[in-house]
Amino acid sequence: MGIKGLTKFIADAAPNAIKEIKIENLMGRVVAIDASMSLYQFIIAIRDSEQYGNLTNESGETTSHISGLMSRSIKLMENGLKPIYVFDGAPPELKGSELEKRGEKRQKAEELLKKAKEEGNLEEIKKQSGRTVRVTRKQNEEAKKLLTLMGIPVVEAPCEAESQCAFLTKYNLAHATATEDADALVFGTKILIRNLNANASSANQNKNKNSSKRGYILTEINLEQVLKGLNLSMNEFIDFCILCGCDYCDTIKGIGSKTAYNLIKEYNSIEKIIENIDKNKYQVPSNFRFVEARDSFINPKVLPKEEVKIDWCEPKIEELKNFLIKDYNFNEVRVTNYINRLLKARKVTTQRRLDNFFTACTKKSTKLVIEESQSQSKTQKEAKSKRKGKKRDAPNDGAAKLNSKQSKKTKVEKEPKREKKDEEAPNGEAHNGDNNEDEETPGMGARDPFDTDDEEDNPSPNFFHQKSDSESGNVKKEKTEQEGNATTAGDVYNYPNGKDTAGSNTHLSSNSTLHSCNNVGSEKAPNEGMHTVGSSAPEAGTNHVGINHVGTNHVGINHVGTNHVGTNHVGSGDLFPPNVADCANNNADKAQPEMKKKNMLFLLPYCPKNVTNVKKRKSVQRC
């Protein structure tokens, strides 16, 4: 049974719905297989090489179907598939006329076969032998017994095997339907697999020149993509297939797949097509039972989900040996080899199914992977450009736009290596260092985790803390204590010559970090060798301007909004003293050279009378 010309039409009109796959792509999947179609293939393919007759045992009974079914099932399981074989039940009444036509064709083929044997024409014998093949009820029962002894599930459909397979995919009991009949799509199977045979894997892997001619390329057709590509609803697709030609009713003469598609697109249903087409050009059959055919596709006779029993059982080894060796005269060595492969294949199927379960959750489409790769590459390039000193605009604080000038790179003498020294934070926790890089700062860009250019990305140790073992994880931060208490919200970073003390009434937001840096050495700077946190820092809502780090021109971490410049967090609103912008503009380009390599801008809310830069020894006057 099938739909005339459907596969070729889909390949032309909806190419994205059809793709060639490897048998490994079905690893861990449950596949519902049309058993009658498989047996038909085995009986045709496995024949005596001399007279193209069926393989038989000593009693003359055909064994081609048993040999083929056992071999293919083991091969599929070795590749990680879990097959379910579905057998045909009684044929539907609508198919009666089609079965009569098939009987007439078979009778004619038998006459031609007899004539070819008399003439000794081997080519004609081979051709007509395939046309006379018929799967008997006895062969079906033998196949069911073999599968049961192998521990493979068997489902007996009340009517058509294709429709039952399709509904197993609808019940989510199977991933796909494996059959050569395209009408499984019309019954609603989600995925249709064609050419699922023991040679498919080798054809896909080796791609030898004869594989495609022999039809060994494994093909997958996706129903959702078919409907999307054809731009049809499911009901329109069913009517389109009926017009193309099915086994349930006759067709309108003169209408092929292309004409049928155009008519469905224009009129949407067979009823409207019959009303509007030219009756002289297109001959509608007098007994055109398209309504019944449509109902057979939409509401086929199938087992409901609760009545479907799929049992994966352990193989019955002794009974299987007796069935093959005693009843059908299979070679004992060959049978032993098959059984050993079967037992190993069952383990492979279980293991690969579990692997597939875990990997399926993280699998990404090719398109998504490409987009992420391009985005990541773009981010890396932008980050490197910023680190190399390209001009950037500082965020606007609401009063004036802050700009930093590019200065020439100057060589800086290396500072003496700092000693590792732990100091206890105000909250009782000691931290040797943390970059506090939990969030990206728009002002300076995120650190590229994939970049290994240490010379560019690691400035002089005079300006950044030494890293400790704790930097590999997130450092725990406590919330700010009540206003008026000493600063407890930030982390303290230890430097060899610096020491931090917190003044009274100093307020930090919960994200603030107190950086202790090397002493600058200004004569008039208070507490030489130490940095103090100014008291009574002005407040703006919950945003606080306080900590003046004179040593390295750090403006005490101002968390306002989400905009950040360097390590100074600047947001919107007039939240700084009037002299902040002027001070920043006057002194921005006098920042230390190593910091300017990173294109950082530092703001000084309170300018000391005389502050001397580390290397240039130039004074910065009060704003």
From Swiss-Prot:
Keywords recorded for this protein, A-Z: DNA damage, DNA repair, DNA replication, Endonuclease, Exonuclease, Hydrolase, Magnesium, Metal-binding, Mitochondrion, Nuclease, Nucleus, Phosphoprotein
Classification via InterPro entries: 5-3_exonuclease (IPR002421), 5-3_exonuclease_C_sf (IPR036279), Flap_endonuc (IPR023426), HhH2 (IPR008918), PIN-like_dom_sf (IPR029060), XPG-I_dom (IPR006086), XPG/Rad2 (IPR006084), XPG_CS (IPR019974)
SMART domains on file: 53EXOc, HhH2, XPGI, XPGN
Oligomer status and interactors: Interacts with PCNA. Three molecules of FEN1 bind to one PCNA trimer with each molecule binding to one PCNA monomer. PCNA stimulates the nuclease activity without altering cleavage specificity.
Location of the region described as Disordered in the Swiss-Prot/TrEMBL record: 368-517
Region (I-domain): 124-267
Broad EC category: hydrolase
UniProt EC number: 3.1.-.-
Domain of life: Eukaryota
Localization: Nucleus, Nucleolus; Nucleus, Nucleoplasm; Mitochondrion
Modifications after synthesis and translation: Phosphorylated. Phosphorylation upon DNA damage induces relocalization to the nuclear plasma.
Basic and acidic residues composition bias: residue spans: 410-424, 466-482
Function of the protein: Structure-specific nuclease with 5'-flap endonuclease and 5'-3' exonuclease activities involved in DNA replication and repair. During DNA replication, cleaves the 5'-overhanging flap structure that is generated by displacement synthesis when DNA polymerase encounters the 5'-end of a downstream Okazaki fragment. It enters the flap from the 5'-end and then tracks to cleave the flap base, leaving a nick for ligation. Also involved in the long patch base excision repair (LP-BER) pathway, by cleaving within the apurinic/apyrimidinic (AP) site-terminated flap.
GO terms classed as biological process: base-excision repair; DNA replication, removal of RNA primer
The encoding gene: FEN1
Protein name, per record: Flap endonuclease 1
Annotated binding of Mg(2+) 2, by residue: D181, D183, D247
Cofactor: Mg(2+)
Interaction with PCNA: region residues: 350-358
Residues bound to Mg(2+) 1: D34, D88, E160, E162
Annotated GO CC locations: mitochondrion; nucleolus; nucleoplasm
Claim: Magnesium is one of the keywords in the record: yes
Residues at which DNA binds: R47, R72, E160, G245, D247
Main location: nucleus
Intrachain S-S bonds: none
Similarity annotation: Belongs to the XPG/RAD2 endonuclease family. FEN1 subfamily.
